């Protein structure tokens, strides 16, 4: 990929026990020899070495490991220097490697070299980047599977099947006087339908399980002053939202994150739903309705101490119409007061101030999220991957009619485009701008 030898600090900035400086390229071993004053490094063996600056002054005592090409992350010669942590030592060693001829790596350049040198495919690169940023055990487990190559195997199987089908068409085009036999057309149609079913299952499962990756979005919905902000604070276990007896205190949506079990949830406290008294409140209520549409789970909160009125009925009807197949938890708050709100369909009774019933509500949320993690279907982890699968499906759909009409050149064109789209999940050779953008989001030492 490049004749440059690059260097960067691979660990996070800050105070710590250990920092790692990574060097990759043809001159990596030469630079390691210059900064250690040692000539012999056995590949993949840790060597305790003194590290010297450009003028021969001792910087630190460190562990130096040499990975000989192609048996390294980048498939180039790589040297990793494990020194004492902190700002000064690591920066001094990095500066010395640059003075000896290395270039400071750009963001994600080590991973980009690994990609272009065939050590990783693009799906694995995406998994690495997202694993570093993972905020829950759910996401980490999914990403670990993708790093092992599960998505790559799936993509290559789909691609190979499409190429196999395309071969029949290409042969018939070469012998233009001959149509595909009817029984072969039926076999191809059946195979394309089978591939469509597989891709649709993957697409649907990925969208349904998006909460495992991004965090499950939970919207708290209800009339003003039923305790939505208090419930948000109780779930977070600290006071995030202002709580007041004045109806309409929350005039906009508030979103916060919290872990429940192995899951990350994004809780949205919404403005109370009622007839708006001013423009600002109207906008807040509109955003509350948007929160229902965008959420994975809805908590519908009602005041047990008040008789159900027209607004309560409206909220129940609204949630039923907007929530669709989403999980909805109906909750009565203020059960310490005389109960006047009678609805047998409400599953949970809570008193937020004493936290009575809150633990049961949290367990119900956890159970819903656990159920989302039971699918064995392949998981797509980015909008780029989802878009590629959707485009593949579109081209397969476009191929059926020309196949039936024996318009084989059009059929072949659509199949070729489908092959390009599915292959782009692991190796999009022709989109340098997209690659630069993706690898540029990595940290410097990755």
From Swiss-Prot:
One of its GO terms (biological process) is tRNA wobble uridine modification. SUPFAM superfamilies: P-loop containing nucleoside triphosphate hydrolases. Its cofactor is K(+). Disulfide bonds: none annotated. Binds 1 potassium ion per subunit. Pfam families: MMR_HSR1, MnmE_helical, TrmE_N. Keywords: Cytoplasm, GTP-binding, Hydrolase, Magnesium, Metal-binding, Nucleotide-binding, Potassium, tRNA processing. GO terms for molecular function: GTP binding; GTPase activity; metal ion binding. GTP binds at residues 225-230, 244-250, 269-272. PROSITE patterns: G_TRME. The keyword Cytoplasm applies. K(+) binds at residues 225, 244, 246, 249. It is found in: Cytoplasm. InterPro entries: G_TrmE, GTP-bd, GTP-bd_TrmE_N, GTPase_MnmE, MnmE_dom2, MnmE_helical, P-loop_NTPase, Small_GTP-bd. Mg(2+) binds at residues 229, 250. (6S)-5-formyl-5,6,7,8-tetrahydrofolate binds at residues 22, 80, 119, 446. One of its GO terms (cellular component) is cytosol. Residues 215-370 form the TrmE-type G domain. Its EC number is 3.6.-.-. It is an enzyme of class 3 (hydrolase). Its main location: cytoplasm. Exhibits a very high intrinsic GTPase hydrolysis rate. Involved in the addition of a carboxymethylaminomethyl (cmnm) group at the wobble position (U34) of certain tRNAs, forming tRNA-cmnm(5)s(2)U34. Belongs to the TRAFAC class TrmE-Era-EngA-EngB-Septin-like GTPase superfamily. TrmE GTPase family. Homodimer. Heterotetramer of two MnmE and two MnmG subunits. HAMAP family: GTPase_MnmE (MF_00379). This is tRNA modification GTPase MnmE. It comes from Sulfurimonas denitrificans (strain ATCC 33889 / DSM 1251). The gene is mnmE.
